[in-house]
Amino acid sequence: MDKRIAIVGAGWAGCAAAVEGVSAGCHVTLFEASHISGGRARKTFVEGMAVDNGQHILLGAYRQTLRLMRQVGIDTRQAFLNLPLQMRYPPFPAVMDFVTPRWPAPFHLVAGLLKAKGLNREDRLALARFFACCRAIRWDIGEDRPVIRLLEQFRQTPKLYALLWRPLCLAALNTSPEQASASVFLAVLRDSLGRKRTDSDMLVPVTDLSALFPEKALAYCIARKGVVRLGETVRHIAFDEKGWVID
């Protein structure tokens, strides 16, 4: 395939697009204003120490992400700590301890809910109502709205919001419930909680986020004659008789 493709931004989406492009035989040029790839999920340096720029987890349902990681040479079995779905807090004071067993879906969720510590009857009923309603509507709410509105609609308790929904939304979407898309959030829940048990497994990175995928993705592209331009800002995109021009 003799196509020239320019990709603006070397976040995870840009890196994924570049990998797919060079794999299809395209001539790919990837532009990134920063000197480090990864976008909102990358390493940064604080006082000379490399740290992640945010807390991120993956879920077992992220099949295409995991496929791309393996494609660029990452051993996904070694790159993550694989945990069953859980939300655990320090036992003192006893706030909440929710852990699902490695049982077939949806029994793992039922068992986790029944055994959860720190949840009262109102919390359990609210959580059960949420999942029952989502399954009934096939995880489709129609017109989109912020996640916070969805939680209010399904009458989730303040404790569930603070200890379950808000942390889960931030971890999965890197966006607060006040701003995150409820449709996207439900799609994540559908893919992770509405299917196989392994889809809900929490994959906690054991390396920095840049090494987890972006750096390997860039090396993969360069090895296939792709061009990576870090530290270059695209300021102008125009179309003329010869095609698209990027400056």
Would you name each region that the model predicts?
Residues 22-46:
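Glycine-rich FAD pyrophosphate-binding loop
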Residues 65-66, 70, 75-182, 186:
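Mobile amphipathic helical/loop "lid" adjacent to a hydrophobic cofactor/ligand pocket
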Residues 37, 41-60, 130-135:
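Glycine-rich active-site loop/strand segments that organize a redox cofactor
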Residues 186-244:
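Helical element adjacent to the flavin cofactor pocket in flavoenzyme catalytic cores
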